[in-house]
Design a protein with these regions (language model features):
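Alpha-helical structural signal in soluble globular domains
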Residues: 1, 5, 60-72, 116-124
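Flexible loop/hinge segments that line or gate small-molecule binding clefts
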Residues: 1-29, 112, 138-150
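Short beta-strand/turn micro-motifs composed of small residues
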Residues: 13, 24, 50, 83, ...
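Hydrophobic alpha-helical segments within soluble ligand-binding/sensing domains
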Residues: 23-48, 63, 67, 87-96, ...
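An alpha-beta-alpha
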Residues: 32-74, 180-193
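Short acidic capping loops at alpha-helix termini that bridge into adjacent secondary structure
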Residues: 44-46, 76-80, 128-133
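Short beta->alpha junction loops
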Residues: 52, 79-88
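Flexible loop/turn connectors
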Residues: 94-196
Length: 196
C-alpha cells in the first residue's frame, strides 16, 4: 500500500518493491557458514526445520544449508527437511521421527522453532547436545539464557534499525541512499552443539 503511493518506507528483509528501503543479512551465506561449522565439528546427519517457505528468508536459509551439505560431500538424501507450521501437538511425533532416523543435529530456522524443539526434547528426557544437538539460524536474548545456550546466527537488530533510519534520512533529505543493504552476521558457537 505505502509502496504503491511512493510513501517513504523501510523494511527489515527483502521485498519485491524497488522503491522501499530494504535492510537484510546474507541469510543464505549465514546458513551455509553455520552448517559448514557444524559439519567441521563432526556432525553428518541433520534436520533442517523451517517455517513458511513463501518467505524469502526461509528459501535463502534452505539454499545455504544445502550448499554446505554438498560442498562438504554429505549425502543430500540423508538430511531431514521439515517446512511449514509445526503444530505443538505434532512436535512429539516429529522429534520421535528425528531420533529414530539418528539425526545428530537439528538446525531451526528461528528462535521460536528452536525453543519449541528444545522444550519438547527436554520434556521427553533427551540431553542436549549429548543425545541431539540444536542450532538456530536466528538469535534472540532467550537463546542466551537457555541451558544449554544455543548455537546461533546473530544479526544485530540495532544495526539493522540504524541502517534503515540512516537510509531513510538520506532519502528524505534528497541525498543519495542505498535501496538495499546487507548487514554482517556472526556465528555464535555455544553449548547446544558442543562435542567432546
Amino acid at each position: 500500500y505505502l509502496a504503491e503511493r511512493n510513501f517513504p518506507t523501510g523494511v527489515t528483509g527483502l521485498c519485491g518493491f524497488d522503491n522501499i528501503i530494504q535492510v537484510d543479512t546474507d541469510n543464505e551465506g549465514a546458513a551455509e557458514m553455520l552448517t559448514s561449522l557444524l559439519i567441521g565439528k563432526g556432525y553428518r546427519r541433520f534436520a533442517l526445520i523451517l517455517d513458511d517457505m513463501s518467505y524469502h528468508v526461509n528459501r535463502s536459509r534452505y539454499e545455504g544449508f544445502y550448499k554446505a551439505v554438498l560442498k562438504n560431500g554429505l549425502p543430500k538424501d540423508r538430511q531431514e527437511i521439515h517446512t511449514g507450521k509445526i503444530r505443538k501437538e505434532l512436535l512429539g511425533s516429529l522429534i520421535s521421527s528425528l531420533i529414530s532416523k539418528k539425526v545428530e543435529c537439528v538446525i531451526c530456522g528461528d528462535d521460536i522453532l528452536a525453543i519449541s524443539v528444545i522444550s519438547q526434547l527436554l520434556a521427553e528426557g533427551y540431553r542436549i547436545p549429548r543425545d541431539i544437538a540444536i542450532a538456530s539460524l536466528y538469535n534472540s536474548p532467550t537463546l542466551n539464557v537457555l541451558v544449554p545456550a544455543v548455537t546461533t546466527v546473530d544479526v544485530s537488530a540495532r544495526m539493522v534499525g540504524n541502517m534503515i533510519g540512516k537510509q531513510m534520512i538520506q532519502l528524505l533529505q534528497g541525498k543519495e541512499y542505498q535501496k538495499k543493504t546487507m548487514i554482517d552476521y556472526e556465528i555464535l558457537i555455544r553449548a547446544s552443539t558442543y562435542r567432546s
